[in-house]
């Protein structure tokens, strides 16, 4: 169904060829699940950075987050069901350069020849993409116990000035607290295009639910509540292929919701009204990559 990787040492690639996923940030998965987290994470922290040059690794074990993490755990010792989200905003003009970037998640304690590679995604570095990595294991949190992951960025065929900033990146770590480590469901990593390829209703492009549930929740807006215009707007964004979770993470969800015309969600909107609203929203979302 979706552009997902096989578990462990897995890889996803979005081709720059004629596969139907174009250079403009095409919808990587028009049939992806249409739900987002059904309850708040116990823990969430973020980092924002710029990627310059051909290669960089962001090592979570070297980030000063553990003091706040330990204080918020309230005597619990394990972080379970962790997720690592990477939102990549390409800054390279596609007319100039269409080199691919390789984004990896690595388990840092592994010193084997493969160096603990968990998952790998490849896509054009000019795109605006949302990576979701599931480490699929609990970690013990305490003094002297660093976060055991690193996110890597590399451009194998880098042809630009080494001082040129090729992307802005948002990294977020989330999870739940537990008194004991827990086995996690082995889940495939996901690669989602934030910007839809089509100018009409194409399906869904959001990431899988964190906890199985029939409700849709995003930033306090619950989908399915009658008369809730915000809920209807979120559902509309999902239906036209906009990744609302990534927009929320980078602080652009509210601005995008304002672009949804009431004519597209009130009563029984005509196909013309929905198509026009989709065109305006998609045009707005695409400006995020300009």
Curated annotation (Swiss-Prot):
Protein name: Protein 3
